[in-house]
């Protein structure tokens, strides 16, 4: 359980300040606040840790400037890229990859909330839930694992790109084979 970091009174205060700056805010929103209907909810998440070993192949490009004569006879400088095959390996430990276990809120909204400081995680205690709603997971473990794997694969590909860019000016055709 990750306990709420802001108490209800502070949430109400922050929401009131935020609402004051929104003169076009819907009346229903203002009404909810006035009726003290703001409600905290505990949302379920899956968390994954994984040790990844990956090998990649790619093409690294080196830029160079060449001087040519244009159709009008004037000299023109152009930048060209020479491409070279390259490969490498990546080792990375993914710690606490959080995957929402709820379908009740859109993923992009949950992503905007940001990450959580999981150092604050506490053992389950019913007191944490007193006065709050809590949702049961609606994303099963296999689907969450698939999402976590996609996230890790995307990040491994980005790490491979960055590794190539340490030696080259450009990168293309990255292919990663990972063992997670």
Task: Please provide the spans of the model-predicted regions.
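Charged, low-complexity helical/coil segments in non-catalytic cytosolic or luminal regions
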Residues: 2-180
